[in-house]
Amino acid sequence: MFKYDKKLPYPIDIKNKDLKMAKYIITQFGGANGEIAAALRYYSQKFSMPTEEGKALLNDIATEELGHSEMIAAMVSQLMNGASVKELEDAGLCSQYTEHGYGIYPNDSNGVPFTASYIASMGDPIANLVEDMAAEQKARAVYEHLIDLADDEDVIQPLLFLRQREIVHFNRFKELYEKYLSQGY
């Protein structure tokens, strides 16, 4: 069912270390409004969609969100590249380093680990799609905040791409939501 393409949906080539941005951006990997939560939410919900069209849409977007999580992980890894333990300490990343070294771990910018409580799957297509539209808007807002915090075009451009994908996903969910309402679901 899944096919892995060995390239990112958008190229990541960050040349400058920026540990504060790494700390902020990790939230889109393992935070409540991040890409892993979105992928699991949509993948779980697809099984209760009443039409093949709905199942396919949620599966397609879930798969895309996994690609976005890989982009975020690549960004964090590149932003941390070459950092000393002292630099990690100065950036407030010591607890991250203590538990995970230079590895990428699904948590938010405060170090709170990912939890399945971030996702919702009601078994009701209308409730799920409203949840999905809200999730995409929250992710869009987080990307806008990250863009505001960034000053490196190598960071800003992938964030702009990810922000735009949230808007596309919102619109796709809205189209399906409106279709289901018109069909009496």
Residue positions per predicted region:
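Non-heme di-metal
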Residues: 1-185
